[in-house]
Amino acid sequence: GIPAADALLHTVLVGPTGSGKSTALQHLILADARAGRSVVVIDPKRDLVTDILERLPAERADEVVVIDPTSPTPVGFNPLAGPDRPEVTVDGVLAAFKALFADSWGVRSEEVLTASLLTLARQGGPAATLAAIPALLTNPAFRRQMTAGLDDPLGVSAFWAKYEAMSPQQQAQIVAPVLNKLQQLVIRPQLR
């Protein structure tokens, strides 16, 4: 196997079809599993994952999560349910949005999305998901509930005070680009 410290570096396996690349990966992955280390396997064909699951040590079986986007009961992933550092979590989510929507990204979209993400990440709980952003931006009662405990007069609290002072038409105008971007994600059950 590869020493754990070396496994943190990039590894490339190159060879023609049938030369044993998947078998080598399987051995490395199973060695990590036996050693109690976590492993992430991304396999679009599922062949490697299936082989690994068949050979996985029985004592590790309860620790396995298979994320299959074609499953009728997908495993959800909430990027806002991170550790106790909501700003770091939000920076990561925001960077992903910027990369996804680089062609249509603007200062206002970033401001609205940053305030929304920070609000939800700081509040936590089951309502703090990407799917809650439309309600946060369009439902005054939900927004009051989610912003009630915020104590950041120069940051998100200032954003929400300014937002609440806007007319419904002004609010709709500044949130429309964000809602359009989010719709592409929240419409899919696997991404909620």
Task: Place the predicted regions along the sequence by residue.
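Hydrophobic anchor at the beta1->P-loop junction of P-loop NTPases
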Residues: 13
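P-loop NTPase motor domains
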Residues: 16-19, 24-192
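Phosphate-binding P-loop
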Residues: 1-8, 33
